[in-house]
């Protein structure tokens, strides 16, 4: 529920007293906010972070912890993988569109190795080991994994596959509760605190404050139910996350997510976007959404995914986020996994970070014809799909969707189907249009003076597609830029 407090900007002339003051004021203490705070402090600014909850972390601390980095990071090299900024850009432009921001992606790829080194210098630990199994994330403390379908069709023909999912090393991870994202946030917050960054908690930002020239000079927030005014002598950085939990904004901009659970935190209510919009800020890719597919990849890769017509529609060995998008956007959220008994048992016994996503078969039969009938599919629909798949699988190929040969195996008997209809949830990727220096742009195309933003409240490197790690990667990368830019203001 969005607060009913007026969102129109306040005039500084109406502020009788500033309750807090700093050179740079950062709204949000997640990955974008902490990165902005560190760089602003290193640039000599006095920094104050306003956090809505009672502690740092945001969605980042609950995330699996993937940071999308490449171009030849020390971790990639240590694990035996070659990559270059150009190769990374080729993949990202193909996978993150349509309409991907080429200037941002070029900038991000060229700065990726330096960004990895920055994280390491801030104390973020990475183990020099690669996890090569299908999965949402490494189940152990391995530091590198494929996280965007780079090694699956069609991307493995477009760019040379290289794993770019960098995960902070952490013991005792619990997916969705305390993931690798915690070990990303903890050292960064400690770095910020050593630099003298201050934080005020239970601060719900309400609106921006501008002077008579239109420059952003502060924020009005609610702290413990009381309005407080916070002055920013140099600049304000917005870093409060997406609008995944604002039903009104979802209905207006990303209606494909209506009724789908938000894969975010409830504090992601879009307030920063609305605050900046009230100043005339431009938006980009507000319809863009990531969609998670809720079935363990170790099972999915060993069967075939079919839609409500019994037809395959996606290579099963690709990134689960891509499967989710293809299912929700193009198959009316209808999906079934057809798999034989031997393959199901093999997948169920495989090591995974998400054993709780191992769905049980709903239907089982001795023949595909019986299974098809039990599922209520038109006679011959599933049979023809399996027949074509098995014909080529006998030779270890998949000319239809190009699943890699290592996962291509004829479907035998007995055979079962998992009912995965509606097994998707998502979060928003669109937001404020920003420059590579994290300046928030007015609809006129000019930067709004004194206002910067980063993270999921902005439109970053993802314009439609997604790869795990682009949120934490983009948020930290452009969070740093926001802090530097804000600190430079007079």
Describe each region flagged by the PLM.
Residues 42-63:
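Glycine-rich FAD pyrophosphate-binding loop
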Residues 179, 223-293, 472, 478-481:
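Glycine-rich loop(s) and the adjacent beta-strand/alpha-helix scaffold that form part
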Residues 207, 215, 381-465:
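A glycine-rich dinucleotide-binding beta-alpha-beta segment and adjacent secondary-structure elements
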Residues 69-108:
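Glycine-rich active-site loop/strand segments that organize a redox cofactor
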Residues 107-225, 247-248, 393-412:
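Conserved redox-cofactor binding core of oxidoreductases
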Residues 269, 273, 282-381:
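An anion/pyrophosphate-binding glycine-rich loop and adjacent beta-alpha core
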Residues 22-49:
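N-terminal Rossmann-like FAD-binding beta1-loop-alpha1 element of flavoenzymes
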Residues 1-24, 42, 461, 465:
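Extreme N-terminal leader/targeting segments of oxidoreductases
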């Amino acid at each position: 529920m969005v607060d009913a407090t007026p969102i129109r900007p306040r005039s500084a002339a109406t502020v009788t007293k500033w309750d807090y003051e700093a050179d740079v004021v950062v709204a949000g203490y997640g990955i974008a906010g902490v990165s902005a705070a560190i760089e602003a402090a290193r640039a000599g600014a006095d920094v104050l972070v306003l956090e809505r909850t009672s502690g740092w972390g945001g969605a980042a601390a609950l995330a699996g912890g993937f940071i999308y980095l490449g171009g030849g990071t020390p971790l990639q090299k240590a694990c035996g993988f070659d990559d270059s900024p150009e190769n990374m850009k080729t993949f990202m432009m193909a996978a993150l569109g349509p309409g991907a921001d080429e200037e941002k992606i070029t900038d991000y790829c060229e700065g990726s190795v330096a960004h990895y080194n920055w994280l390491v210098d801030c104390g973020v630990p990475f183990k020099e080991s690669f996890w090569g199994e299908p999965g949402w994330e490494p189940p152990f403390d391995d530091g590198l994994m494929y996280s965007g379908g780079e090694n699956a069709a069609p991307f493995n023909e477009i760019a040379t596959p290289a794993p770019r999912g960098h995960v902070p090393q952490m013991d005792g991870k619990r997916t969705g509760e305390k993931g690798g994202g915690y070990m990303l946030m903890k050292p960064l917050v400690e770095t910020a605190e050593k630099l003298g960054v201050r934080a005020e908690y239970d601060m719900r930002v309400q609106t921006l404050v501008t002077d008579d020239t239109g420059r952003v000079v502060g924020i009005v927030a609610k702290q413990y139910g009381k309005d407080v005014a916070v002055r920013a002598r140099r600049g304000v950085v917005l870093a409060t996350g997406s609008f995944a939990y604002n039903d009104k904004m979802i209905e207006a901009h990303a209606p494909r997510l209506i009724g789908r659970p938000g894969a975010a935190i409830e504090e992601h209510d879009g307030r920063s976007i609305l605050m900046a919009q009230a100043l005339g800020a431009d938006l980009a890719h507000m319809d863009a959404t990531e969609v998670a597919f809720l079935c363990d990849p170790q099972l999915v890769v060993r069967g075939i995914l079919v839609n409500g017509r019994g037809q395959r529609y996606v290579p099963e060995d690709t990134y689960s986020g891509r499967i989710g998008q293809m299912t929700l956007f193009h198959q009316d959220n209808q999906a079934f996994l057809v798999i034989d008994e031997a393959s199901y048992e093999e997948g169920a016994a495989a090591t995974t970070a998400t054993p709780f996503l191992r769905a049980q078969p709903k239907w089982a039969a001795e023949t595909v014809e019986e299974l098809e009938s039990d599922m209520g599919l038109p006679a011959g629909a599933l049979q023809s799909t399996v027949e074509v798949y098995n014909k080529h699988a006998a030779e270890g190929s998949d000319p239809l969707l190009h699943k890699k040969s290592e996962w291509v195996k004829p479907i035998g008997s007995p055979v079962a189907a998992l009912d995965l209809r509606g097994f998707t949830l998502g979060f928003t990727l669109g937001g404020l249009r920003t420059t590579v220096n994290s300046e928030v742009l007015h609809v006129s195309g000019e930067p709004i003076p004194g206002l910067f933003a980063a993270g999921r409240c902005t439109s970053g490197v993802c314009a439609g597609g997604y790869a795990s790690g682009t949120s934490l990667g983009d948020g930290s990368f452009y969070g740093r830029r926001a802090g530097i830019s804000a600190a430079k203001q007079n």
